[in-house]
């Protein structure tokens, strides 16, 4: 059964107040959340990746966007937020709901949602500390285009089990790259 959009919206509205009161503890909270998300994503695999080798695809992960040395902290947090938001959107679709074991999908979505809350709290806090623009628009656009390519691939492959397996592996890869960005952020603190 698809995740109820109205339920997700209710959770979003109810937790919005708490976002503003949270402090930014990104290095610990996001790193742990990212590890939990990776574990859940690994558990979601239903078919052997080896049976889907013919479906592999290069989605053009914008690796340079995960090189935190080129960003200020607020911009790096914004890139992380966009990546998690796009992942959440991808796995909140009806097609995604049909592809994965429901309890694992719900846990994964909940983990992503919590990471979004943490990142939003950090953006709110960091914007007050820095006079730089909130986002590096080119970086955000690169992340969005990356996810558009993933969505187009799924559509072209008619959301087949192998297509979802390839996407699952790709999202694990992108979450791993975001871990590198988090390490750089920790050094900047």
UniProtKB/Swiss-Prot annotation:
- Pfam families assigned to the protein according to its UniProt record, in alphabetical order: Interferon
- Name the predominant localization: secreted
Task: Enumerate the Gene3D superfamilies for this protein.
Answer: 1.20.1250.10
Could you tell me which cysteines form disulfide bridges? 24-122, 52-162
Q: Which PROSITE patterns match?
A: INTERFERON_A_B_D
| GO annotation (BP), single | T cell activation involved in immune response
Q: Which GO terms describe its cellular component?
A: extracellular region; extracellular space
Question: What keyword terms does UniProt attach to this protein?
Answer: Antiviral defense, Cytokine, Disulfide bond, Secreted, Signal
Regarding protein family, the annotation reads: Belongs to the alpha/beta interferon family.
**Summary of the function given for this chain in its UniProt record:** Produced by macrophages, IFN-alpha have antiviral activities. Interferon stimulates the production of two enzymes: a protein kinase and an oligoadenylate synthetase.
PANTHER family, from UniProt?
A: INTERFERON ALPHA-10-RELATED, TYPE I INTERFERON
Q: What is this protein called?
A: Interferon alpha-17
The organism encoding this protein is: Homo sapiens (Human)
Give the gene symbol.
Answer: IFNA17
């Amino acid at each position: 059964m698809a995740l109820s959009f109205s339920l997700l919206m209710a959770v979003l509205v109810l937790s919005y107040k708490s976002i503003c009161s949270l402090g930014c503890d990104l290095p610990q909270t996001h790193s742990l959340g990212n590890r939990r998300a990776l574990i859940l994503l690994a558990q979601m695999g239903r078919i052997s990746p080896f049976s889907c080798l013919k479906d592999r695809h290069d989605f053009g992960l914008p690796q340079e966007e995960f090189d935190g040395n080129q960003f200020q902290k607020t911009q790096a947090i914004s890139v992380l937020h966009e990546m998690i938001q796009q992942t959440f959107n991808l796995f909140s679709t009806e097609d995604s709901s049909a592809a994965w074991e429901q309890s694992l999908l719900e846990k994964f979505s909940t983990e992503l949602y919590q990471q979004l809350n943490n990142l939003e709290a950090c953006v709110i806090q960091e914007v007050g500390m820095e006079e730089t623009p909130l986002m590096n628009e080119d970086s955000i656009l690169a992340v969005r285009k990356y996810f558009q390519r993933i969505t187009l691939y799924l559509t072209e492959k008619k959301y087949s089990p192998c297509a979802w397996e390839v996407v699952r592996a790709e999202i694990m890869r992108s979450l791993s790259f975001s871990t590198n960005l988090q390490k750089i952020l920790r050094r900047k603190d």
